[in-house]
UniProtKB/Swiss-Prot annotation:
Descriptive protein name: U-actitoxin-Aeq6b
UniProt keyword annotation of Secreted present: yes
Molecular-function annotations in GO: toxin activity
Location of the protein in the cell: Secreted; Nematocyst
Organism name: Actinia equina (Beadlet anemone)
Length: 83
């Protein structure tokens, strides 16, 4: 009987951790971690110029996007940003 009570308490604690823990809420804002993994992958290959650079601040699967030269296309940097 005591094992059953311990098991029930353990299950409730684990469920509470899963459902109430802020780290598992799926939330997190970009202010928490500026290099958080985002999926701005739609900008990969986008046309970029000096005047119009859609790559700035975009991250695709942990890789920061940038415009290698003026009048080119957005590509991913090879350095991985953990997030």
């Amino acid at each position: 009987m005591i094992y059953k009570a311990v098991f029930v308490c353990l299950v409730l604690v684990l469920l509470g951790d899963v459902f109430c823990s802020p780290r598992n809420s799926g939330g997190g804002t970009l202010n928490d971690n500026p290099f958080e993994k985002r999926t701005d992958c739609r900008f990969v290959g986008a046309k970029c110029t000096k005047a119009n650079n859609p790559c700035v601040g975009k991250v695709c699967n942990g890789y920061q996007l940038y415009c290698p030269v003026d009048d080119d296309h957005c590509i991913m940097k090879l350095t991985f940003i953990p997030g």
